[in-house]
Amino acid sequence: AESSAMKFQRQHVDSEGSSSSNANYCNEMMVRRKMTQDRCKPVNTFVHEPLADVQAVCFQKNVPCKNGQTNCYQSYSSMHITDCRVTSNSKFPDCSYRTTQAQKSIVVACEGNLYVPVHFDASVEPST
């Protein structure tokens, strides 16, 4: 079975990619990364930074998670991300997404012996 850490990488890490010149980025990636198989996942964020940099966030600023848990961490620096949001006229299995890129600080939940990201909690303006 796919581990939580591997699922996080599949759903949220695209180190080599960028949506900068591709309005279809989300439509392509949401299918390629298997997030449209049983439904159209409504919202998803891809992080375009090296995996090691994303994993390092687990040792950065400890912040509360949206669900109240305490194992979330915010990156000190902003990261190049792409937000994918399902469009209102999207009908499964023809999932259609709006692609928005940003530079933001990311918040991830971490767990396990290696203490790696297992959940993408939010993207926020970097705190000064």
Curated annotation (Swiss-Prot):
Record localization: Secreted
Source organism of the structure: Hydrochoerus hydrochaeris
The keyword Hydrolase is annotated on this UniProt entry: yes
A GO biological process held by the record: defense response to Gram-positive bacterium
CDD domains linked to this entry: RNase_A_canonical (cd06265)
InterPro entries found in the cross-reference section: RNaseA, RNaseA-like_dom_sf, RNaseA_AS, RNaseA_domain
Name of the molecule in the record: Ribonuclease pancreatic
SMART domains in UniProt: RNAse_Pc
Tissue: Pancreas.
E.C. no: 4.6.1.18
EC top class named in words: lyase
Disulfide cysteine pairs (residue numbers): 26-84, 40-95, 58-110, 65-72
Family indicated by similarity: Belongs to the pancreatic ribonuclease family.
Record carries keyword Hydrolase: yes
Catalytic activity annotation: an [RNA] containing cytidine + H2O = an [RNA]-3'-cytidine-3'-phosphate + a 5'-hydroxy-ribonucleotide-3'-[RNA]; an [RNA] containing uridine + H2O = an [RNA]-3'-uridine-3'-phosphate + a 5'-hydroxy-ribonucleotide-3'-[RNA]
